[in-house]
Amino acid sequence: MREFNHNDLEILEEKTAWSGFWKLKLFRLRHRRFAGGWSEALTRELHCRGEAVGVLLYDPKLDALGMVEQFRIGAAFRAGSPWLLELVAGLVEEGETPAEVAVRETTEESGCVIQELLPVAGYFSSPGGTDEYFHLFCARVSLAGAGGLHGKPGEHEDIRLHVIPHAEVPELQRGGHFNNAHTLIALQWLAMHRDEVRRAWT
């Protein structure tokens, strides 16, 4: 079976349709087809988000997770609350590595200090319309006495940290309390690797 790569894509035109906090680019392109030959010229919109990081905070001694709650505009127009329970997360800025972002965002959003950082996965969050590439980590932290409000006021962040015993996670999942894809992926990973992680970190 033939494998396709960047040589099988031709960009005919590229322009910026919108530039604000995010960019929206408009492309005219064509690509090779599985049956042979080239597609007709296609128009595709691309929401340019770049790279992002998500961090699952885990305390192996307490066997507990740290989750943040904050308002999300993307959830504001569906049933349920637009305040989501999710991972610590943030964007990779120029000159930063994903691991550095994980450390920075963990401090800003939770007040916790990462003691050890374990890569979990890297993936495109929704490649049909955005170029965002997500780096997922699990971080060993101490959640003893953790909680309260966090975030950078200058960035209008209003974040509440929740400490959740791992034993309560299945019931919360069944109740639909985790509806963010990155969070669900991280929780599934922890369910598969929790015993191994606890042995390594305790």
Q: What are these regions, as identified by a protein language model?
A:
Residues L24-L26, M67, L136-C138, L161-V163:
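Conserved hydrophobic/aromatic beta-strand scaffold that supports enzyme active sites
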Residues T16-L62, A76:
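Acidic, metal-coordinating catalytic segment for phosphate/diphosphate chemistry
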Residues R44-H47, A64-R104, P153-E155, I159:
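Conserved Nudix-box catalytic region and its N-terminal flanking loop in Nudix hydrolases
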Residues L29-F34, S126-G147:
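Active-site-adjacent beta-strand/loop module that shapes the phosphate/pyrophosphate-binding cleft
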